[in-house]
């Protein structure tokens, strides 16, 4: 084997070999259980980020683990067309390169442009996924707009429409005036901002008076421009100030519209003035109030967010109405919405109706892609009736057919599903699945799989002109069909029979509603088993947290704290990293701050760590459902782990290749150390499998690390040396056999988390075991064997380790050179302790570097010594001639003084109010941690001073 571990040399060639050999495919053995994971499809033109790397590492670990258990495994891969995101990228591209808009191109040509862009950049993410070692079946790769998936989408739309579960209606949506499309709640970013609350007088009609004798109500609003669309004023029915006015009217300022006063819980007595203006066409809460009181809806805005020239008036059901005039005062027509706000306030003030303006903290919705304030807008959209679909989806989780890990996310799911709103599925975009609906000139709507079918079903001749709906479906609509459409539905395929329901879905909790819930609803509606019972899309939902930076901040381009997973694999220089973080930024003014932070954090750029180290770190940080603060130190630690495993394997191979390892017979004697490591490994297998089976990848990674680093490398390899340097033939054969057996098993155990290094080493080790198989990927996963439990070997070895560590600690504390042989005396020995010493003198002398071992008679106190107490004995190391008492005390005093200096430095820092107020929580916690560490170190040194002073 190469002297040093170089992941760059082994990873890519190995992956290409695996893929070419077809190892990632299902084994097709239908007598075995199936195990299937559907990858959450990343955006086709996107690139891999830490969230992908994290979730995909977890999925690949599960898939490799199940594949090694002989199951028929499928990891279904594919990408998402990502409607709005992809369209925006291409719009920006043609604007920058050609100075054109999509309208200059026209719909067909612009869509061709997007397909071109997909062909050009669509391979980036799948290339990057290969670099992670993902063992997905590439031959089955799907795209949400490929022909098969597009047919499935049409099929679902048509069937739901025919079942009256899809309808077209006029409803309020989140409208992005910049992108001119409806967007989902997930694409709305709520920002806290400082605003105002305007208090405006609305004169009472018909000579009515309020309880305080005034002839007006004062209405509080944060959006005075929408006053032009008011159709009511709400007061709380319990409010003594106003309850007698319910059913009376006010005259709307500026417009002179006569609008009713309604009693509604939506008006809080304590908030503002207790009177709320109701604008059903421009506010989600008002829309609901309007429905409860049958108030008309008046839309005053264009799709660009400007004031219309004349308003649109609708009744509660969304039909056009003439109950109110559609006139808008000329001075406000065509004004941009925020200019209109100023103009309305000025006009109200001029009439003497502006009572006061108060500062007010409010939450303002922004479109996360367009970056402008979102407007609730009354538009014609297509909707899915969600309550019918939600009922079985709630029951599936209630009765345990689907389980969430961790369980607390079920509550989040229930709270949303039990209060579900109809789902707006239409988007005013060009890129996506076009809605399969056609209109004739009279505005009648026909839904079908294609125009030909529509004409045939509805007996429409060629003389009837039809135009297809311009809108496309919400991206989440096609994603909701992902688990079954990718397996060939609506055809009844073998794949669907074998792999559906899938086994586990790995997802972030932020998309429980947008994706997880909708997959459950759609799947249970369309997929039934042979008895007609609805099928679930998956049995388990494993929820991951978000990956944040080391200070707990969300990773984002604007913060400049994004780390590309492949930069940790391959390494990146500081100039390249700076270019990546500050090049073509949306907000260039942040570049300087980002540059400084990056230079401080990565003065030399990022070193290459290899894929296995990245995967190990991700697995180790995967504590269920919690957000993860990324830690470069952990990544370095796991790269060191890979080096340690590599070097340990070289040691094993150097000592066993060309030797008789007992795989072809011959007498074998196992030493205590051999018996111990076999028993220890057996226990490790049990604990490790339990961790993987319960989705505790963090615990599994910890078990693997602890066994490999501490038990196998640090202890067992050392404990083999006495046998290697002087054992009998049978003993040598026993130790060689154990070394190879445990290493080979360990490589299989570790393979799901660190596939590249384990395969590379295993190819050498398998020869010694007489294994002829091609790849570790298809080897059986290690199994716990209850008959291999060896309590005696475990107990005896733990005792020896205790004794060796005690001697090593005395050396360190007394500053004795590691190579100097020592005398060891044992006092007050139990029978077990004496037996253990007598049976294992060779081990003890070699590993603790001892010149002699003497068990003292019961009444012998022994010479002046440093002592340590272990189980069933007291260890003594005589100090005569080993240390100079005065020098040693002086050295310790110096150490104590140095540590006291550090302690007072940190204490002063933490006492500085300015530092505590400014520094991030994480930095303060780190300082406190350091302080604790120094305090412990000082206590230990003082203890040592006392021991030496007493000699």
Curated annotation (Swiss-Prot):
GO terms for cellular component: cytosol. A motif ('KMSKS' region) lies at residues 554-558. The keyword Zinc does not apply. GO terms for molecular function: aminoacyl-tRNA deacylase activity; ATP binding; valine-tRNA ligase activity. A motif ('HIGH' region) lies at residues 42-52. Residues 880-944 form a coiled coil. Keywords: Aminoacyl-tRNA synthetase, ATP-binding, Coiled coil, Cytoplasm, Ligase, Nucleotide-binding, Protein biosynthesis. The keyword Lyase does not apply. InterPro entries: aa-tRNA-synth_I_CS, aa-tRNA-synth_Ia, Anticodon_Ia_Val, M/V/L/I-tRNA-synth_anticd-bd, Rossmann-like_a/b/a_fold, tRNA-bd_arm, tRNAsynth_Ia_anticodon-bd, Val-tRNA_synth_C_sf. It is found in: Cytoplasm. Pfam families: Anticodon_1, tRNA-synt_1, Val_tRNA-synt_C. PANTHER family: VALINE--TRNA LIGASE, CHLOROPLASTIC_MITOCHONDRIAL 2, VALYL-TRNA SYNTHETASES. ValRS has two distinct active sites: one for aminoacylation and one for editing. The misactivated threonine is translocated from the active site to the editing site. Monomer. Catalyzes the attachment of valine to tRNA(Val). As ValRS can inadvertently accommodate and process structurally similar amino acids such as threonine, to avoid such errors, it has a 'posttransfer' editing activity that hydrolyzes mischarged Thr-tRNA(Val) in a tRNA-dependent manner. NCBIfam families: PRK05729.1, valS. This is Valine--tRNA ligase. It comes from Shigella dysenteriae serotype 1 (strain Sd197). The gene is valS.
